[in-house]
């Protein structure tokens, strides 16, 4: 592990360099999902979920589906379907220990992002699960988020990254199959791993 010589350890030291936010940067935070936020969420096919366990160990998990897959139940409640995955349950087990959650919504082609913070429960109500069905299959679990904060994040990171262009497209990276073989120390070929993942993409979505 690297040893650094100049490490910020107090907020006073941080603020002496960073300064303080003011105006719109602080006033933009609202405590509910208004019509503007609702429209963005209903247009979003992708959201990142940040959670932590009781010790503070963090995890960020991506969720994706057709636009509007996260439903606005009311101005203070969001419903997120938990589709089939690898059964690790990182987000779910974290929420059982610590209900706090942070969401980051993206809409392809848009430079702004929407941040939502709150608390969450794992629910199994049949009516709730049914309203989030895809291809005739209801999610096993639904993450119900009680919204405490909602605000739009500025566009600078998207402008810097050129995320929605092909400028940084990289086909030279190894396949996911190769990465899993190496990291999980599997005794299978790249072709077998890639074939399994390709089939899972077709048959295991819902």
Annotate the PLM regions.
Residues 1-206:
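Binding-site signature for planar aromatic cofactors or substrates
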């Amino acid at each position: 592990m690297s040893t650094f010589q100049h490490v910020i350890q107090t907020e006073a030291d941080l603020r002496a360099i960073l300064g303080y936010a003011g105006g719109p940067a602080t006033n933009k935070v609202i405590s509910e999902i208004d019509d503007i936020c609702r429209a963005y969420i209903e247009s979003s096919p992708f959201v990142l979920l940040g959670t932590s366990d009781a010790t503070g160990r963090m995890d960020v998990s991506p969720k994706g589906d057709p636009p509007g897959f996260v439903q606005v139940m009311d101005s203070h409640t969001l419903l997120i379907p938990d589709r089939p995955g690898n059964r690790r349950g990182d987000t779910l087990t974290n929420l059982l220990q610590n209900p706090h959650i942070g969401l980051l919504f993206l809409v392809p082609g848009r430079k702004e992002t929407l941040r939502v913070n709150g608390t969450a429960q794992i629910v199994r109500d049949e009516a709730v699960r049914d309203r989030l069905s895809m291809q005739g299959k209801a999610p096993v679990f639904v993450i119900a988020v009680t919204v405490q904060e909602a605000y739009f994040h500025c566009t600078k990171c998207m402008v810097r990254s050129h995320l929605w262009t092909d400028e940084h497209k990289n086909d030279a990276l190894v396949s996911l199959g190769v990465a899993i073989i190496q990291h999980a120390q599997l005794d299978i070929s790249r072709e077998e791993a890639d074939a399994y993942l390709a089939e899972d993409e077709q048959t295991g979505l819902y």
